[in-house]
């Protein structure tokens, strides 16, 4: 009965959209973020911060924080949210693993940090925005942001901005200011793009 409930045209369309968004996100993170060392806010940035401050492996901290965020998302958004998030998260991992099998399109993009920051924001913003629009979260911080936005009625891009600014500000304890500024540009732009796509009709 549960399978029959979800196997509808609307559900299949949503799954295709989730996979598309996850593919775009994975492409951007592999070909731009990884090659340029642009850092992030949210859970990813916080795991790097905890590794620097407390020597806690991101493998452990990300698992714990994502589990907490998804639990909050489940309690706030319901079971459909968890199903969609599971699909988008698995699709992201799959697509990223595929992209890793090929050389980066522009391996020297790190030499052009401004280009990397803007391009990275576009791929992250569009990829996550598409997933959020149909009700899925590719990672824990998206789940937390969506939950906070639903409860507080504050637009999603401003929740992203506040959380990312907080993490990036704390990251100044171990990352040079110049690199943080480029990362700030990325998270501000991507957050605005996510918010625009998520509410666009």
PLM regions and their residue ranges:
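Core subunits and conserved enzymes of cellular information-processing
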Residues: 2-201
């Amino acid at each position: 009965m549960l399978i029959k409930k979800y196997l509808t045209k609307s559900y299949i369309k949503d799954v295709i959209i989730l996979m598309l968004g996850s593919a775009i996100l994975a492409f951007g993170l592999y070909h731009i973020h990884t090659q340029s060392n642009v850092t992030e806010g949210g859970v990813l940035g916080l795991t790097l911060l905890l590794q620097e401050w407390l020597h806690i492996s991101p493998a452990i901290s990300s698992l714990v924080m994502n589990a907490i965020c998804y639990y909050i998302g489940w309690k706030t958004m319901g079971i459909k949210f968890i199903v969609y998030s599971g699909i988008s998260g698995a699709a992201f991992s799959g697509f990223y693993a595929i992209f890793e099998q090929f050389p980066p399109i522009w391996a020297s993009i790190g030499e052009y940090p401004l280009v990397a920051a803007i391009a990275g924001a576009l791929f992250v913003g569009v990829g996550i925005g598409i997933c959020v629009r149909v009700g899925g979260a590719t990672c824990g911080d998206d789940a937390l942001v969506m939950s906070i936005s639903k409860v507080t009625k504050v637009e999603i891009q401003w929740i992203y901005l506040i959380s990312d600014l907080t993490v990036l500000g704390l990251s100044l304890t171990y990352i040079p200011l110049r690199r943080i500024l480029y990362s700030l540009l990325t998270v501000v732009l991507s957050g605005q793009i996510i918010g625009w796509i998520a509410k666009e009709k």
